[in-house]
Curated annotation (Swiss-Prot):
Belongs to the class-II pyridine nucleotide-disulfide oxidoreductase family. This is Thioredoxin reductase. Disulfide bonds join 138-141. It catalyses: [thioredoxin]-dithiol + NADP(+) = [thioredoxin]-disulfide + NADPH + H(+). The keyword Flavoprotein applies. It holds the Pfam family Pyr_redox_2. Homodimer. Keywords: Cytoplasm, Disulfide bond, FAD, Flavoprotein, NADP, Oxidoreductase, Redox-active center. Binds 1 FAD per subunit.
Length: 311
């Protein structure tokens, strides 16, 4: 069994920032990059241009930003492993963590496994198709991209998050279409009224996108009316999934307190979870903001909390 004083599960802005702070505090953390969001390094590894992370006035590629963070953490003494932690035991001290390759133990643990955007299996939406080439799951992250400016954009969903995305996208697109397979929304009445009163938003009821097409970027969508089965093709520059996120917490086996949506519950103003010595950072405990910079900040908090815990 391999022991480390501090193990960080997950990478991305929260995991790497936690590692930078922890390694500078001479905690010699072991970081499992993992593939919880589908790729080692988190969701930013599938993002092209990141324009809202401080310090990069011209923007920076998502993979470049993550590689920079990783290099910084490693330079200060973090050891990284490209493995997934598949199970944990927080009932014993030191904590026991298992990957497919090895068993590890630690005195403190930071969970930074993120949350994965729920996606529909639509032709054209895959990672090797138009994902991050016009198809995305974060309007705030990607909406200002030049490929969306003054173009027709489509949001899939019917809840508050879908309408928030649609309202945000009206700043950039020429028109925003909300595609919903039912004839009424799940969103709050106040949010629905705001969207209904926005002349740049149109609702496509009883409809679903069945195909996304383009060349190097998205150019069109096929939309099916679920009642008549009629399919129409429309010009489109962007398709935004707004059907929720799933926090990557299944591997915890119910050992930490989660909220009703599966996010890790932390003590207000800290990264402390329901188990002393276990801390959470990033999107795995943040259902509201989900930004690279807020994730990085929470990673810093988790490292400082872990340092104080370890003494």
């Amino acid at each position: 069994m391999i022991h480390s004083r501090l193990i960080i599960i997950g990478s991305g802005p929260s995991g790497y920032t936690a590692a930078i702070y922890a390694s500078r505090a001479l905690l010699h953390p072991l970081l499992f990059e993992g593939f919880f969001s589908g790729i080692s390094g988190g969701q930013l590894m599938t993002t092209t241009e990141v324009e809202n992370f401080p310090g990069f006035p011209e923007g920076i590629l998502g993979p470049k930003l993550m590689n920079n963070m990783k290099e910084q953490a490693v330079r200060f003494g973090t050891k990284t492993l490209a493995q997934d932690i598949i199970s944990v035991d927080f009932s014993v001290r030191p904590f026991i963590l298992k990957s497919k390759e090895e068993t590890y133990s630690c005195d403190a643990c930071i969970i930074a496994t993120g949350a994965s955007a729920k996606r529909l299996e639509i032709p054209g939406a895959g990672n090797d198709e138009f994902w991050q080439k016009g198809v995305t799951a974060c309007a705030v992250c990607d909406g200002a991209s030049p490929i969306f400016k003054n173009k027709d954009l489509y949001v899939i969903g019917g809840g508050d998050s879908a309408l928030e995305e649609a309202l945000y996208l009206t700043r950039y697109g020429s028109h925003v279409y909300v595609v919903h397979r039912r004839d009424k929304l799940r969103a709050s009445k106040a949010m629905e009224a705001r969207a209904q009163n926005n002349e740049k938003i149109t609702f496509l009821w009883n409809s679903e996108i069945v195909k996304i097409s383009g060349d190097s970027i998205v150019r069109s969508v096929d939309i099916k009316n679920v009642q008549t089965q009629e399919i129409t093709t429309r010009e489109a520059a962007g398709v935004f999934f707004a059907i929720g996120h799933k926090p990557n917490t299944d591997f915890l086996g119910g050992q930490l307190t989660l909220d009703e949506s599966g996010y890790i519950v932390t003590e207000k103003g800290t990264s402390k979870t329901s188990v002393p010595g276990v801390f959470a950072a990033g999107d795995v405990q943040d259902k509201y903001y989900r930004q690279a910079v807020t994730s990085a900040g929470s990673g810093c908090i988790a490292a400082l909390d872990a340092e104080r815990f370890l003494g």
